[in-house]
């Protein structure tokens, strides 16, 4: 099964015909959404329960994990330990997990998260924390894809039942992360299409959020990506 979804549910006026859409309205058009609300702060359990109730049974969420979990937030300001942080996050997400509307928790690491023994050990901690829950890992440092590491990295992802996110993003000379279609978890595959706007990807001004993924794929690019999606769909359940 192939599910198509967008990032956030409220900002797609061309989809719903409204400037600000509700999750209920979005869910009448697409069967999946990626949400990053929890990345900026763990939401109340009641709020997550409201999201779950707003969508039909066959709807699924890709939920980006709290920034502290992906080594990008100052979790020490709010939690006494990593275990307390994880407990708070999983408690918040309980309605999503129990409803079986979770497609995957997305752990999106930054470009500084390189292929080191320490970071491999941290990935093992993530699997331990989340037990058998579906986890999609996005690696934004090209050291993981170097010829002397990539085979071991893919095997590690398989052994830990991680779904390595297949990413299409701008190829920055200093840190080119390749489009690498490969199934590491036959239960689910997650593609993310960030566009190919190199200048926007590197923007660091006040408008960087609007520029980062500002890109219009042409017909041939869409055809090429669609072919990859179809091929991977034959190797995974979803």
PLM-predicted stretches and their roles:
Residues 1-238:
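Residues lining hydrophobic/aromatic ligand-binding pockets adjacent to catalytic sites
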């Amino acid at each position: 099964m192939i599910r198509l979804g967008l990032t956030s549910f409220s900002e797609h006026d061309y989809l719903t015909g409204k400037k600000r859409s509700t999750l209920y309205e979005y869910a009448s058009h697409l069967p999946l959404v990626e949400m990053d609300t929890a990345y900026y702060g763990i939401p109340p359990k009641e709020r997550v329960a409201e999201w779950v109730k707003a969508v039909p049974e066959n709807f699924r969420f890709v939920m980006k994990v709290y920034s502290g979990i992906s080594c990008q937030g100052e979790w020490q300001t709010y939690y006494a330990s990593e275990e307390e942080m994880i407990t708070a996050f999983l408690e918040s997400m309980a309605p999503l997990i129990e409803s079986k509307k979770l497609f995957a928790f997305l752990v999106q690491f930054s470009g500084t998260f390189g292929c080191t023994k320490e970071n491999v050990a941290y990935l093992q901690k993530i699997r331990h924390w989340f037990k058998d829950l579906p986890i999609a890992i996005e690696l934004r440092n090209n050291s993981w894809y170097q010829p002397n590491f990539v085979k071991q990295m893919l095997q590690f992802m398989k052994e830990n039942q991680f779904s390595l996110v297949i990413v299409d993003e701008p190829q920055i000379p200093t840190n080119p992360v390749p489009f690498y279609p490969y199934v590491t978890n036959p239960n689910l595959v997650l593609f993310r299409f960030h566009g190919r706007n190199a200048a926007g990807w590197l923007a660091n001004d006040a408008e960087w959020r609007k520029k980062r993924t500002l890109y219009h794929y042409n017909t041939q690019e869409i055809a090429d990506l669609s072919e990859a999606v179809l091929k991977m769909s034959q190797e995974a359940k979803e």
